């Protein structure tokens, strides 16, 4: 029990992981949580593990790239403890000002051998996030899942459209966002999120490419097992996820998960049909991303089967 308590304290009190700005608050909070954790373990009430750990891996994006699917699939591994919600610690000032102690409190309880994973898709496109993540842990391993940029734009629009529909609020057609004065509206935020090379350059200012594993989101949807195997290797996890953990659901039209005899699929909001777009406008979209895609391929040293 003494060894367990010592391990718990060591896990939550890691001074080298405290960023410069919220250092004092973070350190005090970490020590406070260590004391609380000691009491919990002594009383035998620590749930699902012995301690909360700062994430050793973060899924940084991209929005509508398949981050939820990736997290759910990765959670099949027994050595992975995943945060349930998008924490938005590094990109929301209100959260970041609370310090690392607050961030730690958002993590799941886990065992020392487990890898804690957090996902917030907005991190990838937020200019201030890479430096903040680096300040916490320059050795952290990052997962980035990307899909065809044009398809990502349509999916981005679709999510916002349905959010408005559920609230019975009107929302303009996608053409109204994509076209302005007869030309492609390059100020549309969804287009900017798909300029992968711009955002990747920002991350590579702080992290070497070997610390960032890019998951092919299109392949993950079509054939998830090989992509998850690559993620296991990148994270140095033992190969525990099997092909039998995935099955194709004909009704939903995508792969679902099978874990310990239980089947589960992603939320019904995933896999929604995209709006019909005029082929000429779609071609303009493909042309717009052609050069940015080439720059991204050169940046990361690999290609993707995108339009």
Swiss-Prot record:
Molecular function terms, GO-annotated: [heparan sulfate]-glucosamine 3-sulfotransferase activity; sulfotransferase activity
Tissue expression summary: Highly expressed in the brain and kidney and weakly expressed in the heart, lung and placenta.
Coiled-coil regions, chain positions: none
Gene3D superfamilies linked to this entry: P-loop containing nucleotide triphosphate hydrolases
Keyword Hydrolase listed: no
Keyword entries, A-Z: Disulfide bond, Glycoprotein, Golgi apparatus, Signal, Transferase
Xref: InterPro entries: NST/OST (IPR037359), P-loop_NTPase (IPR027417), Sulfotransferase_dom (IPR000863)
Glycosylation sites per record: 48, 192, 242, 249
Localization of this protein: Golgi apparatus lumen
Single GO biological process annotation from the record: heparan sulfate proteoglycan biosynthetic process
Residues involved in 3'-phosphoadenylyl sulfate binding: 64-68, 147, 155, 255, 270-274
Disulfide partners: 256-265
Reaction it catalyzes: alpha-D-glucosaminyl-[heparan sulfate](n) + 3'-phosphoadenylyl sulfate = 3-sulfo-alpha-D-glucosaminyl-[heparan sulfate](n) + adenosine 3',5'-bisphosphate + H(+)
Leader sequence segment: 1-20
Enzyme class per UniProt: transferase
Keyword Glycoprotein: yes
Gene Ontology CC, one term: Golgi lumen
EC number: 2.8.2.23
Function: Sulfotransferase that utilizes 3'-phospho-5'-adenylyl sulfate (PAPS) to catalyze the transfer of a sulfo group to position 3 of glucosamine residues in heparan. Catalyzes the rate limiting step in the biosynthesis of heparan sulfate (HSact). This modification is a crucial step in the biosynthesis of anticoagulant heparan sulfate as it completes the structure of the antithrombin pentasaccharide binding site.
The family this protein is said to belong to: Belongs to the sulfotransferase 1 family.
PANTHER family: HEPARAN SULFATE GLUCOSAMINE 3-O-SULFOTRANSFERASE 1 (PTHR10605:SF16), HEPARAN SULFATE SULFOTRANSFERASE (PTHR10605)
Name this polypeptide is given: Heparan sulfate glucosamine 3-O-sulfotransferase 1
Originating organism: Homo sapiens
Gene: HS3ST1
